[in-house]
Amino acid sequence: SSLLTSVAVNGCAPYKAVLTHGFTMDGEGRKMSKSVGNVVAPQDIIDKYGADVMRLWISSVDYQGDVRLSDKIVKSMSDVYRKIRNTFRYLLGNLYDFDPKTDSVAYGDMEELDRWALLRLEQVKRTVLKAYEDYEFHVMYHAVHNFCTVDLSSIYLDILKDRLYTEKDDSLLRRSAQTAMYEILTSLVRLVAPVICFTAEEVWQALPNREEREWSVHMADMPAENDRYMDKVLEEKWKKRLALRSVVTKALEEARQAKVIGHPLDAEITIYADGEHLETLKAMEKELADFCLVSQAKISGDLSAAPENAFASEDGTVKVSIAVCTLEKCERCWERTPDVNSDPKHEHVCARCAKVLTEMGE
């Protein structure tokens, strides 16, 4: 009626844009009805799970069609919310001694892994900003969820743990990681603020260097795009590396389930590959063990030399054999290396950890 009235009186629509949406159905796709007893009240969800979980669910659905809502669906959404919240907690927890004014590392001096993380952040940032402009909130939801659970939790932060926990507090390696984490944190909290507004505000108030920022995340601008992070060469290189790591991760999980190993750091792996895969492996030979989260890693360019029980990629172009590493375990970093006990002042630790302990005056 408002459309007809406005057109008749003013000759134009009373709004710039209009969105259409479907109905909210129950978990089985049936129309909600009090007589049937399948009505899910939003206030009940908010009371049980919190407003941010409700808002996150709303952002996750494609509202242009009918959407389903049930306690089971919301419970699943609360698990997703918890993963996002835990990502924020982990980032904040590892920035306790980081001052962005004095400790930040220049982009060109950062570790390549950290620059890859910023590349992924930039891609997610652009996806989310466009999704908001297009009112496609479910695109924003999936981009953030995937970034937190896959790019950060399963890859970046998993590899980063060793650097964060074993390196000297003010080392370049650790500060490089913290610089990337700080950029990720301050960007991500603004990207999700329109949806999980209460959680975003909670994170904002806990940020390092908080006094120099807007008093509320909801008063801050969205993060600006940064073309420098969009490194196509780096993207292609890490696409190949992560594909290989995925094969190793599956092989390690299979070995763990078969009780061949207990923890990945108990493993010694040999990766068999040729052609382009072999070139990728050789380019990262020095950091391969750390990248795959194992104690020792070897490379073979002869696929036919792989043992029969070696784990093979789906296309058979990469094979991984896993054995228990018999080297002594460093009590500080848990890696099994040949240089454990090499420093008489620091027993039962590897040479790297002994060096760090010496630098720390211990």
Each model region followed by its residue ranges:
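Catalytic adenosine-cofactor/nucleotide-binding cores of aminoacyl-tRNA synthetases and other
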Residues: 23-28, 32-110, 208-213, 258-263, ...
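Core structural elements
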Residues: 79-92, 112-124, 142-164
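Acidic, turn-prone loop/beta-hairpin segments
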Residues: 98-126, 157-251, 255-275, 279, ...
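Short cysteine-rich clusters marking metal-coordination/redox-active sites
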Residues: 330, 350-353
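Cys/His-rich metal-chelating microdomains
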Residues: 336-339, 356
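Short linker/helix segments within small regulatory modules
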Residues: 339-348
